[in-house]
Amino acid sequence: MANIKSAKKRAVQSEKRRQHNASQRSMMRTFIKKVYAAVAAGDKAASQAAFVEMQKVVDRMASKGLIHANKAANHKAKLAAQIKKLA
């Protein structure tokens, strides 16, 4: 455990940030799973609507540095290709 006051503060801030990031990451994964579920169900309209929402969330997380920009691009490209196949 930290003995210096500033180190204690940093430990508290770090834990708070870790919990917030975990929450944001979980929320992002939920949006991604919604798109996969809609694609698996074969519902093109629902999958496109879910994709639009997922895209916003993933881009926001990439811009904040929670995930790498390339990972966001990979998620979007992979899901867009699957939705395109539904036609």
From Swiss-Prot:
InterPro entries: Ribosomal_bS20, Ribosomal_bS20_sf
UniProt KW keywords: Ribonucleoprotein, Ribosomal protein, RNA-binding, rRNA-binding
GO function terms (MF aspect): small ribosomal subunit rRNA binding; structural constituent of ribosome
SUPFAM superfamilies from the UniProt entry: Ribosomal protein S20
Sequence segments annotated as region (Disordered): 1-26
Record GO biological process: translation
GO CC entries: cytosol; small ribosomal subunit
Any Pfam family: Ribosomal_S20p
Chain intervals with Basic residues compositional bias: 1-11
Similarity comment: family membership: Belongs to the bacterial ribosomal protein bS20 family.
Function: Binds directly to 16S ribosomal RNA.
HAMAP family: Ribosomal_bS20 (MF_00500)
Protein name: Small ribosomal subunit protein bS20
Species per Swiss-Prot/TrEMBL record: Actinobacillus pleuropneumoniae serotype 5b (strain L20)
Gene: rpsT
